[in-house]
Amino acid sequence: MEPSKLFTMSDNATFAPGPVINAADKKTFRTCFRILVLSVQAVTLILVIVTLGELVRMINDQGLSNQLSSIADKIRESATMIASAVGVMNQVIHGVTVSLPLQIEGNQNQLLSTLATICTGKKQVSNCSTNIPLVNDLRFINGINKFIIEDYATHDFSIGHPLNMPSFIPTATSPNGCTRIPSFSLGKTHWCYTHNVINANCKDHTSSNQYISMGILVQTASGYPMFKTLKIQYLSDGLNRKSCSIATVPDGCAMYCYVSTQLETDDYAGSSPPTQKLTLLFYNDTVTERTISPTGLEGNWATLVPGVGSGIYFENKLIFPAYGGVLPNSSLGVKSAREFFRPVNPYNPCSGPQQDLDQRALRSYFPSYFSNRRVQSAFLVCAWNQILVTNCELVVPSNNQTLMGAEGRVLLINNRLLYYQRSTSWWPYELLYEISFTFTNSGQSSVNMSWIPIYSFTRPGSGNCSGENVCPTACVSGVYLDPWPLTPYSHQSGINRNFYFTGALLNSSTTRVNPTLYVSALNNLKVLAPYGNQGLFASYTTTTCFQDTGDASVYCVYIMELASNIVGEFQILPVLTRLTIT
């Protein structure tokens, strides 16, 4: 064994230390070792941290995935439930809005037909109140107050020759007699009609009586309809009823009139409105008449006048058109003081500064002819279930939506409400609005008006308000010429031009002459059919159309005031024609 390099032995037996490692070298070695150990520990720690982080991430990802999967499952379950609920709701909506109304209408028609069948026979053995039931022929029931055309397509029209039928409107019987102001309403079960019989020529502020009739549509042997009169009432009680409007109601007719023996201009100059009358006539010969004072009348109106055109029975309410003069310092007068509506014909606009035109439009509501009263349109609304106590209110539209108040008519077609307003002020074209009411159990009801832009023809007018004038100015002119819409109006762009309506116009810009049957679109007349000789004097016209659902024939009755050279100044004539649509 090699001797130790650390120690050596000498001869004198003493020990001496051998070579020794340097202390500095040992310190460096320890430092390197520590650095190495720390590095290994650091790397190990980092690896542990990274590994733990990755494990945590994987665990979290798995949990999130599970959560997302759970949420997705719940969403799919909810979507399935919603789809099922939507399907049920669609079935309910279709049932309520389509199937049920059709079923009810079918049952109603069947019931009416059954009643018409059983209510026949001799009066002694009949179980009905009268020999003939107040029910239109079944062929017409489902074609009344319906839009004839609903496809918005382009159509052509032809108006047939007047059909020869007995007139349901009696004429005057003396040279100085006068029958004027016809009002006609056709309901699903029956029709109602009225006109004024003036005793001294056509001065309606003197003395007059009121003729009222009700009847049904029947089919003649020739195949076309006839207006069969079943009941007549002649109100000759000394009251000078004026401007009466009629409406068909369950089992009878309702009529709204006002009573006055002074000039219309004097009514506007006063401060207290004339007497308002509501008359109910039923098929069992019951006649009930009440003086009414609708909410909003006293203190607001100098005068209130029925609209002449027919009213409607709608949602258990009786609605009539009206208009009149508003007192300037009344709450209604103050509220509407700055309101005005100025329509514009884009094909024939009025030139001038807009501010000036607006001021002129505002002034047009205050004609000096009517003592500078604001002339305002309104609606008389009466709750039918309280009709015997005449619980009525006046619902006043905003003048920001309507022109100056005038005569008018309320139409109910396919459950849509429309309002015709006579063009009495400066606007020369037909005025037709879609309207919607908001009725309240307490407080003031309201109405919204949406103007239908018609520019196809003008009414005759005098002075600055002839049929050629399109600029705002104050005047009282024009003539009552109500239209009958054949199609619903749509606000959808591009199809409004296919809105069609028919009526009888007076083909002159200044004179009430040349009665002419027509069919019109918004911007152009489709067909014209003059009635009588050129220059024939005429006045008010009112039109109603219906369909024979048995053979799909369309009929229109144009009721016109025509000049008479034999008996009286006017003869009211119902002209029945067949309307062909292709």
Swiss-Prot record:
> Does the record carry Glycoprotein as a key word?
yes
Task: List the catalytic activities from the record.
Answer: Hydrolysis of alpha-(2->3)-, alpha-(2->6)-, alpha-(2->8)- glycosidic linkages of terminal sialic acid residues in oligosaccharides, glycoproteins, glycolipids, colominic acid and synthetic substrates
Site positions (Binding to the glycan motifs of the host receptor): 180, 242, 264, 323, 369, 407, 422, 512, 540
Q: Which residues cross the membrane?
A: 35-55
Per the UniProt annotation, where are the glycans attached? Answer: 127, 284, 329, 400, 448, 464, 507
- What superkingdom does the record give? Viruses
Q: What is known of its domains?
A: The C-terminus (head domain) is involved in binding the cellular receptor.
Assembly: Homotetramer; composed of disulfide-linked homodimers. Interacts with F protein trimer.
What is the role of this chain?
Answer: Attaches the virus to alpha-2,3-linked sialic acid-containing cell receptors and thereby initiating infection. Binding of HN protein to the receptor induces a conformational change that allows the F protein to trigger virion/cell membranes fusion. Binds to the glycan motifs sialyl Lewis (SLe) and GM2 ganglioside (GM2-glycan).
What is this protein called in UniProt? Hemagglutinin-neuraminidase
Give the classification, highest ranks.
Viruses, Riboviria, Orthornavirae, Negarnaviricota, Haploviricotina
